[in-house]
Regions:
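A generic structural signal for residues embedded in beta-strands
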Residues: 41-42
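Short, surface-exposed loop/turn microsegments at beta-strand edges and helix-strand junctions
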Residues: 1-7, 33, 51-66, 71-74
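Amphipathic alpha-helical segments
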Residues: 80, 115-155
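Short, charged beta-turn/beta-strand-edge "cap" motif at the junction between a beta-strand
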Residues: 45-49
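Sequence-specific dsDNA recognition surfaces
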Residues: 2-36
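Heptad-repeat alpha-helical coiled-coil segments used for dimerization/oligomerization
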Residues: 155-161
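A short glycine-rich beta-alpha junction/loop motif
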Residues: 58-65, 100-127
Length: 166
C-alpha cells in the first residue's frame, strides 16, 4: 500500500496517523498517485490550502489536484511553484474562488485554474528567478534557525538564573 500524503503550508508531508489530527478517509481506494516531482494542490480551501512539488512517492486525496508541467524542458518547476504559492499567499486564487468562505471552503474550480494566466518568461529567466528566491529563502531559514537557537539558550539561562537565585 502507498504511503498517504497531506498537503500543508509546510509542504507535502507523509500523513501522520498516530496523532489523530486531520481528516481520515473511510476508504483509500480512490486516492490518486503522487510521484516525486508532481505538483499537488489543495484547491478546496484557498485560505489555508497550498501547492507544492512532491519529494515523495505516495497517494493523496482524490479531492486534491495533482498535475505535472506540460513542457519540462521549457518550464522551470520551481518558478511555477513559487508563482502558484504567491497566488495563495497574496490571495490571488481567492479572488477567483467560489463556495462558502465563512465555512472555510472557498474553492478554485478546475476551469478557473486551467485558464489562469501565468507569465512565462524564457527558461533562463525562470531559472534565475527561482534560484534567487531559493537562495534568499535558504538564507532566511538559516537566520531563523540561528535566532531560535539563541532564544533557546536565553530560555535555559532564564531557568538556571531563577534556580540559582531562588
Amino acid at each position: 500500500m502507498q504511503e498517504k500524503k497531506s498537503i500543508t503550508q509546510r509542504g507535502i508531508i507523509p500523513k501522520d496517523f498516530s496523532n489523530n489530527e486531520g481528516q481520515f478517509a473511510n476508504s483509500y481506494a480512490n486516492y490518486q498517485l503522487v510521484h516525486k516531482g508532481d505538483f499537488a494542490m489543495n484547491h478546496m480551501d484557498l485560505l489555508t490550502g497550498w501547492v507544492d512539488i512532491s519529494k515523495y512517492e505516495g497517494v493523496t486525496s482524490p479531492d486534491y489536484r495533482v498535475f505535472v508541467l506540460n513542457d519540462k524542458n521549457g518550464m522551470c518547476p520551481k518558478y511555477y511553484l513559487y508563482m502558484m504559492q504567491m497566488c495563495y499567499s497574496a490571495r490571488i486564487f481567492y479572488g477567483l474562488g467560489q463556495g462558502v468562505s465563512g465555512m472555510g471552503r472557498w474553492r478554485l474550480q478546475a476551469d478557473k485554474f486551467l485558464n489562469f494566466y501565468i507569465p512565462i518568461p524564457p527558461y533562463d529567466e525562470q531559472k534565475k528567478i527561482a534560484d534567487y528566491i531559493t537562495d534568499k529563502v535558504n538564507h532566511i531559514e538559516v537566520e531563523i534557525d540561528k535566532r531560535n537557537k539563541l532564544i533557546k539558550k536565553y530560555q535555559e539561562y532564564k531557568k538556571s538564573l531563577i534556580y540559582e537565585v531562588v
